[in-house]
Amino acid sequence: MKKHMLALFLACSMLCTLGACGQQEESSAVGEGNSSLTDSADDSAADSRPADSAAPDNSSKGEESTGRNEQNPESAADTSGSGTDSAAEPSGNTGKPSSGGNDAPGSQGNTSDSGQHTASTTAPRQEQTPSVTTVQAETTPASEIKTITLLGDSVRFEGTGIAARGSRVGITKGGTYRISGSLSDGQIEINTEKKVVLQFDGMSITNSAGSAINVINAKRVTVELMPGTVNSLEDGNVQHDADRGALFTNDTLVIGGSGTLNVKSNYAHGIISDDDIIVNGGTIRIVSTNRGLFANDDISINGGTLFCDAGTNGIKCKNTISINGGTSILMGGTREEKGAIIVLGGLTVNGGTLYAIGNTCTLPLASSTQNILAFNFTSALPANTLTRIASGSNPLFTFTSPRAYKTVICSGTGLKDGASYTVSTGGSVTGGSNTDYVITGGSYSGGTDRGTYKSTGRISSFTVS
């Protein structure tokens, strides 16, 4: 019995000893593990501090990079010519309700043929026009104006950011440039990320092989027509896809001042912008084999006189057109799908005087704030046929066209709701004046009465048989 008890005691002692050793080994293992982690952390803190501190910096940089990427549209707008107030919202869509979100421009392009969403997108764009006008009105101190004098087949200039080779001029810096003289076969090319102001001070450029002015890049280009001056631009009749117009710009174009600009396009468009076109003043006369005025984004006409005599479309725009002031005389071609005004995103007329004459024309939206008369003749009127629209004995619109036309849209402050208007075609005017096919004054006789039509509201559209 004692032997058995002794054996049991020895076995228990061995088990206890083994258990204690196992606990000590396990405890030692955990301790080493903790010690290892702690040492590793300490070593990292002491020996690898730059690496640890770099991690938050990398994370921070990543966040900053993301932030910059989110703002890239605004940055792009600032350097591509969309920094004007009229173009800033679509390019900087960062959740602003007025911009319609990033999908707005795309959806407009996709639905432009059906005309959907145009009323909701036109109004915000119009609200931005006054701010653009204010920016355009800023003046440059005389000491900061650079001069470019065109000397037929050479150029003389004063100021930085200008380079010249023969009759070719390059502008590579922002600023204000006053241009005078003439080039018989040359070009001004602009390539900068800054704003550029071109003061046309009695200048003329003809380029037989391309555009007269070619803006590759600029934040915004403003053309100031100096008081009392007559200026002209003309392109060649050879193919020049890269330029596509007598005056071509990749970015927003603002035209103002009180002088005159005559544009003749022998190959394609008169004035074209891949961004917006804003007309604030001056007298602009465009004669073009293709479109007179063309913009990929918006066109705003706020003042001045714009005359377009175009082989296809008087003015065309892929987004919206708003006519808010001035006098616009727009004449389109005779092909079925061509007209005085063609716009994919919607046309609004809120002021000024409008003559739109062509084979067809986009009808203004109901959101327009000025009364509009639209007449569609069942048979085209021959070229040079006079049309007269009168209220009683008071002539309101009298005009002709160098080409046959079927559609006429007119607007002016004299139109009233519920008033009646008489349309006459043919005949002649004695003693009046004819400017850009619009006739004022004189005595009208010999025309054919085509009927009297009563205004039915803001936009009145009639068929004339």
Predicted regions and their residues:
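A composition-driven surface/loop motif
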Residues: 8-15, 21-43, 47-55, 60-74, ...
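Secretory targeting signatures
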Residues: 2, 19-20
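Bacterial N-terminal signal peptides that target proteins for export
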Residues: 1-8
